From Swiss-Prot:
Gene3D superfamilies: 3.30.1330.200. This is Probable chemoreceptor glutamine deamidase CheD. The lineage of its organism: Bacteria, Pseudomonadati, Pseudomonadota, Gammaproteobacteria, Pseudomonadales. GO terms for molecular function: protein-glutamine glutaminase activity. Keywords: Chemotaxis, Hydrolase. InterPro entries: CheD-like_sf, Chemorcpt_Glu_NH3ase_CheD, Cytotoxic_necrot_fac-like_cat.
């Protein structure tokens, strides 16, 4: 579907959560961060978050979109505020790319990208969300473009090539 006349374009920075009820194109650039898209196929409303870490070490009263659990809670609250049920949204997950694959981690310790991927999947399951697609993990960054008028998400993945020299 073509971009509707008057559709707005919003670029999300890390830690931002956006929910729109008007035609909009949402964009973000992800490395080890994860984006969650929410789209209601009947209402053509939804949003996206760009979280940096799975959760905050210490709880705080105000929600903060930098943390996955809180960013998802913000999206759920927006859905409820628009008289819709979170389980009626199509949910897609993106990101969690290794940005420094040449740095070998201790096998007992997960890195931020892996923690974000595991957290996103666990949160989707815990909230019984309708997970329609995912493109997470591997190396490199992703450009995400999410069109609210039709629910399409476009992903451009730029992997990082690791040479033998880098792996040392």
């Amino acid at each position: 579907m073509r971009k509707p006349v008057g559709a707005i374009e919003i670029v999300l920075a890390p830690g931002e959560v956006v929910f729109e009820t008007r035609p909009a194109r949402l964009r973000t650039l992800l490395g080890s961060c994860v984006a969650i898209t929410f789209w209601h196929p009947q209402q053509h409303i939804g949003g996206m978050c760009h979280f940096m870490l799975p959760h905050r070490p210490h709880k705080h009263k105000a929600l903060d979109g930098r943390y996955g659990d809180e960013a998802l809670e913000m999206l759920i609250r927006h859905a409820l505020a628009n008289h819709t049920k979170p389980r009626d949204y199509q949910v897609k997950l993106f990101g969690g790319g290794q940005m420094f694959p040449e740095q070998q981690n201790d096998s007992q310790q997960l890195n931020v990208a892996d923690l974000n991927v595991h957290a996103a999947l666990a949160m989707a399951e815990r909230h019984r969300l309708q997970l329609k697609a995912q493109d997470m993990g591997r190396t490199g960054h992703r450009t995400i473009i999410f069109d609210l008028w039709d629910g399409n998400v476009w992903v451009k993945h730029q992997p990082i090539e690791v040479t033998e020299k880098d792996a040392r």
